[in-house]
Amino acid sequence: MIADNSKDFDLKSFLANLTTHSGVYRMLDKHGEIIYVGKAKNLKNRVNSYFSKGAKDSKTLMMVEQVARIEITIAPSDYEAYLLENNLIKQHRPKYNILFKDDKSYPYLVISRDKFPRVSFYRGKSAYKKGQCFGPYVSISSVKNTLNIIQKIFPIRQCENSYYKSRVRPCLQYQIKRCLAPCVGLVSQEQYDEQLAILKKFLAGKFSSVLEEISAKMYQASEDMEYEKAQVYRDQLVILRKLQQQQIVDIQEDKTFDVIGIYMQDSYASIALLQIQNGDVVADRHWSIDAKGQDKTSIMHAFLSHFYLGDEIRNIWPKNIILSKVEFADITDLMNSISQKIGQAINWIVAPAADNLKWLKLAEVNARQKLNIYTSSKSQYQKRLESLKEFLELEKDIKRIECFDISHFQGEATIASCVVYTDEGEDRKSHRRYNIKDIKAGDDYAAIHQAVSRRVSSGLEADNLPDVMIIDGGKGQIHQAEAVFREYGIQDKVQLVSLGKGVERISGKEKIYKGFDDTEYTLDEHNPGFLLLRQVRDSAHDHAIKGQRKKVSANRQSSIIEEIEGVGPKRRKALIMYFGGWQELSRAFVDEIAKVKGISNKLAQEIWECFH
């Protein structure tokens, strides 16, 4: 059970004694869950406004009714307050805040910390751990395009460390002058670092400076009669100037724009972000959100904070930002905080004209198109949820569905997958897999029993059981889940249902069984609820197959090494520690394997032969 956190909190006294400093406030419900995070210049005035008389939208009224406790944090500046607010929203995702769902993390270009660093791209919040980051980039295609350009200009390695360490002669990239071959010692540390320094300036957007520096180095090398070196610099200049003419690289730094368009309809909103360089759209991204009770200004405020302040390692910034028409005074403080983070002023364009207006209209058209697709898809999904609710004869709306599927390879490497769907759609971040242990090979019934038991046990502890649990299988599988439900006494808390292929084993002809009901049900193959059941089941099946294949692959590679005489647990561990995994080991050459402590040249040869 979750404790009631409202008992010792005196709201009236708290409001009366609030500070007038700037800071962040958090509103919590009776369970201690943060339901809203806000930032205020004057905490006393802002927080009290929620509880004073006056016109409020229905969403705010509903939120205030649930407030059982308020916590505050005083911030030394508006900038610090915005950062804290953003971090708390990302961490807790309060249900009454405007939330932006990013299906994937932004990609970064990363220069590694190796002696001879490699340049690559990495997606994720921990990109900074890999090395020096440049970004974020809006899309994978834009970061890959930049990598291709880099490879043509700067002969910095892009290969994986395992490949780099195993080289005994230069690869093709050296032959076509796209790498300096540090792997085999064909370049000095000083020469490599020089190219690396110019590359970093290039990635930081200092293109004019890069041109000047390379040009100066070319003339200096020529004067020193280092003609081969001068030729390298000349080739770099030729490519850079060609790119400049093609407007692939933005040499005129003041011609970079971010354009943010918002389109609202009913209780939904869509935000389109276009990135413009020299008159071309080079990247775009979209967000669609539930905007009930919000206006365009509050959505713009939330988005600017999310996109520009929410990423601690961002170091690529536009010179100009064009915005949809909003109440400028309400976002001025946020604009100043963003400029403070950058360390320089941004040109905010809130009343665009001419070409700038053309870009804004394009962004708003994109936002409208994406919202139409989003609302259509959402409407279809809601119809499926309602249909499933009706079929299962549930009183309450379905908020969370989980589905289990079992996968194994000839009885081995058994995996149970659990996929999650909410009332918003598939929740990929909540998907998980269970390694099934201590059962008879190929025993799907025992596997279902174990997986469901583990999920129910953790769900009761965390108070996050689903409304509906789907089992991929027929009567035998659902009976195993029923046994678990009886054991934990949750027969009336979670609706159990299974989807079996039946005798015909044809998609669309599946048999449906409800928990603790021996009746065999069938639905029309176009029934919305039936379509949802199959959609969730198929997702669970795919998730299980992927996990099972990974496990089989890992087991196979591990067993290959185990068969080699002289490679025991200690040496296997040493190999994995050195290469980072079986896949990297399989790519290594004999001389590289022999570098591992305890591995002789003869043993290294045997290990190499196992993989080839």
UniProtKB/Swiss-Prot annotation:
Q: Boundaries of each GIY-YIG domain copy? A: 20-98
Could you name the Gene Ontology cellular component terms for this entry?
cytoplasm; excinuclease repair complex
What molecular function terms (GO) are annotated for this protein?
Answer: DNA binding; excinuclease ABC activity
* Gene3D superfamilies listed in its UniProt record: 5' to 3' exonuclease, C-terminal subdomain (1.10.150.20), GIY-YIG endonuclease (3.40.1440.10), UVR domain (4.10.860.10), UvrC, RNAse H endonuclease domain (3.30.420.340)
Q: Which InterPro entries match?
A: GIY-YIG_endonuc, GIY-YIG_endonuc_sf, GIY-YIG_UvrC_Cho, RuvA_2-like, UVR_dom, UVR_dom_sf, UvrABC_protein_C, UvrC
Cellular compartment(s): Cytoplasm
Q: Which UniProt keywords apply?
A: Cytoplasm, DNA damage, DNA excision, DNA repair, Excision nuclease, SOS response
Q: For the UVR domain, which residue ranges apply?
A: 208-243
Q: Which GO terms describe its biological process?
A: nucleotide-excision repair; SOS response
Write one Pfam family the protein is assigned to.
UvrC_RNaseH_dom
Q: Is DNA repair among the key words of this record?
A: yes
The UniProt function text for this chain reads:
The UvrABC repair system catalyzes the recognition and processing of DNA lesions. UvrC both incises the 5' and 3' sides of the lesion. The N-terminal half is responsible for the 3' incision and the C-terminal half is responsible for the 5' incision.
Subunit comment for this entry? Answer: Interacts with UvrB in an incision complex.
Q: Which family does it belong to?
A: Belongs to the UvrC family.
Name used for this protein in its record: UvrABC system protein C
What gene does the UniProt entry assign to this protein? uvrC
